[in-house]
Regions:
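C-terminal segment of N-terminal export signals and the immediately downstream linker at the start
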Residues: 1, 18-31, 35
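N-terminal secretory signal peptides and thylakoid transit peptides that target proteins
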Residues: 1-14
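An N-terminal domain-start capping segment
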Residues: 6, 76-83, 136-147
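Extracytoplasmic substrate-binding proteins
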Residues: 28, 109-177
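A short, structured surface patch at a secondary-structure boundary
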Residues: 28, 34-82, 86
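Short polybasic/polar patches that bind polyanions
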Residues: 41, 135, 194
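Binding-cleft/active-site segments that stabilize strongly anionic ligands or cofactors
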Residues: 61-117, 157-259
Length: 260
């Protein structure tokens, strides 16, 4: 159990912000992306508004989103009137909401960041985005310090993982009781695993975003008895009560071995 918790923490290293820089006077920034909001907080900047802020405690958890941050609503259906009323100096987005860009530009300048592309190196893209955002905010030193702390942490975790020598990992998110999203090449998780010397059991196809949605039974070739399966929260409410009775799930060798 202790090793499992350590592995979970190691995987989260590339996804969660490190300790934030000291807050200082900053522009009023709204963001339509959790990752960009995380980066702002790590740079010592609290956004004035975030899309889907209500779901932050389920999908992000740490760090907690300050209570004063305004919820703009679901990312593709954000409350544009509310956003305009907040008078932001800058709006941060991703290509995922490109269809809104022209309307957003009527409110404030827009800065868009892309982490997932054909290069399939999202961690490197995230590093570059961090430095680009830090430069825009006049926080270059904070941006470089953030990346330096991350590299130091990766190095320390790699040493510990080399000693424990964990087996292959299978990273999944349940979509419903019969289907999962499994993460492979091109995902941020894969980049983190590569840096830590961890092995991904999934060698199947993956989308541009580094995952593939498959039936539970399709996990079997990757879910050998030596594989540990990690599931990400939140798990749909209807899944947990039925999972123990699912023959598709219970017959996976990794599940039979108790590696779940």
């Amino acid at each position: 159990l202790a090793r499992r918790r350590f592995l979970q923490g190691a995987l989260a290293t590339g996804l969660l912000p490190l300790p934030s820089a000291k807050a200082a006077a900053s522009p009023r920034i709204a963001t339509l992306d959790y990752g960009l909001a995380n980066t702002l907080l790590s740079l010592g900047v609290t956004p004035i508004a975030v899309a889907a802020a209500e779901g932050w405690s389920d999908w992000v958890v740490e760090p907690p989103l300050p209570s004063e941050v305004v919820d703009l609503g679901v990312d593709r259906e954000i409350n544009l009137e509310l956003l305009a009323a907040l008078s932001p100096d800058l709006i941060l987005t991703t290509p995922y909401v490109q269809s809104l860009r022209s309307r957003l530009e009527e409110i404030a300048p827009v800065l868009s960041f892309s982490v997932y592309n054909e290069n399939k190196r999202p961690f490197r893209q995230a590093q570059e985005a961090t430095l680009r955002l830090a430069e825009r905010l006049g926080r270059e030193a904070e941006g470089r310090a953030l990346l330096d702390r991350a590299e130091t942490l990766f190095a320390a975790l790699s040493v510990r993982l080399h000693v424990s020598d964990p087996g292959p990992l299978l990273l999944v998110r349940f979509m419903d009781a019969r289907h999962v999203r499994v993460y492979g090449g091109g995902s941020l998780f894969q980049d983190v695993m590569d840096r830590l010397g961890l092995r991904n059991a999934w060698e199947g196809p993956a989308t541009l975003w580094g995952f593939e949605t498959v039936g539970v039974e399709q996990l079997a070739p990757a879910a050998g008895p030596e594989t540990e399966i990690f599931t990400f929260e939140p798990v749909p409410q209807e899944v947990l009560p039925t999972l123990g009775n699912s023959p598709l799930w219970r017959r996976l060798p990794a599940v039979e071995a108790g590696n779940f």
